[in-house]
Amino acid sequence: MTKSELIERLAGQQSHVPAKVVEDAVKEMLEHMAGTLAEGERIEIRGFGSFSLHYRAPRVGRNPKTGDKVELEGKYVPHFKPGKELRDRANIYG
């Protein structure tokens, strides 16, 4: 599901709320979450999961076109850990 599909689906479920208001709310929520992570803070949504930053250590990578070795710096990357409730709902084959 893309962001625009999410907005469309939410707007359809909330017919009393204009689609533009739903779009603005979704965009603002995602922007706020990204800003919170950029400040190094963790986000926890009970029953859904948590977002945090994980550190990736420096390493030697390869340029896919040339095969040359490339030194990659350490960096922080976003990480999502699903909550138990979400894991249980997503486990449709278990």
Curated annotation (Swiss-Prot):
Keywords, sorted A to Z: DNA recombination, DNA-binding, Transcription, Transcription regulation, Translation regulation
Annotated InterPro entries: Hist_DNA-bd (IPR000119), Histone-like_DNA-bd_CS (IPR020816), IHF-like_DNA-bd_dom_sf (IPR010992), IHF_beta (IPR005685)
GO MF annotation: an example: DNA binding
Keyword Transcription regulation: yes
GO BP annotations listed: DNA recombination; regulation of DNA-templated transcription; regulation of translation
Disulfide cross-links: none
CDD domains: IHF_B
Pfam families, per database record: Bac_DNA_binding
SUPFAM superfamilies membership: IHF-like DNA-binding proteins (SSF47729)
Signal sequence annotation: none
GO cellular component assignments: chromosome; cytosol
PANTHER family per UniProt: DNA-BINDING PROTEIN HU, INTEGRATION HOST FACTOR SUBUNIT BETA
Record's subunit section: Heterodimer of an alpha and a beta chain.
UniProt name for this protein: Integration host factor subunit beta
Organism whose genome encodes this protein: Yersinia pestis
